[in-house]
Amino acid sequence: IPFLLSLGSKFLGGVLLDKMRPEQAPVLFVVGGAMTALSVVALMLSHQPAWLALFMLSANVFWGLQGAAIPAVIQHHAAREAVGSAYGIINGIGNICAAFIPLLMGMVMRSVGSVSSGFSVLVVSQVVTLLAGGMLLLRMRRAAAISA
């Protein structure tokens, strides 16, 4: 089920992007980041198995929703002859960061002494995504307004 939900949310993100103007693409980072962070906070605070499952799955959906925005933003900003290289660099940096998230979560869990505390790392990552997406959204809207 988690894989299918992730696949579906990535597809939904792509469909939404197809209906948006290019300068609106960061909206998915803002909304997806906020909803993922809220889902993870709810997960951390919940103790009922059904709610835990629901919040984990909802975090997965909102995380996946953001995926399609990455190549869309890169295509909008990168020079036409460098889109593939730009995406490769961004994807590589993202993979390196993602590789350290479980380690960082484990360090937080060990220092605080609870499993749920480790999920705060995911909350912070999504707050950063929300803020960066918001700044990118403002920047892209300003650029679109100037060129219009």
Spell out what each predicted region is.
Residues 18-33:
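Cytoplasmic membrane-interface "Motif A"-like loop-to-helix N-cap segments
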Residues 34-47:
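C-terminal ends and interior cores of transmembrane alpha-helices
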Residues 107-126:
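A membrane-interface helix-boundary motif in multi-pass transporters
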Residues 50-65:
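Hydrophobic core of transmembrane alpha-helices in multi-pass small-molecule transporters
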Residues 77-112:
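A late C-terminal transmembrane helix in Major Facilitator Superfamily
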Residues 10-22, 109-110:
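Helix-to-loop junctions at the C-terminal end of transmembrane segments
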Residues 43-44, 120-148:
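Multi-pass alpha-helical transporter architecture, strongest
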Residues 65-78:
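Intracellular juxtamembrane helix-capping segments at the cytosolic ends
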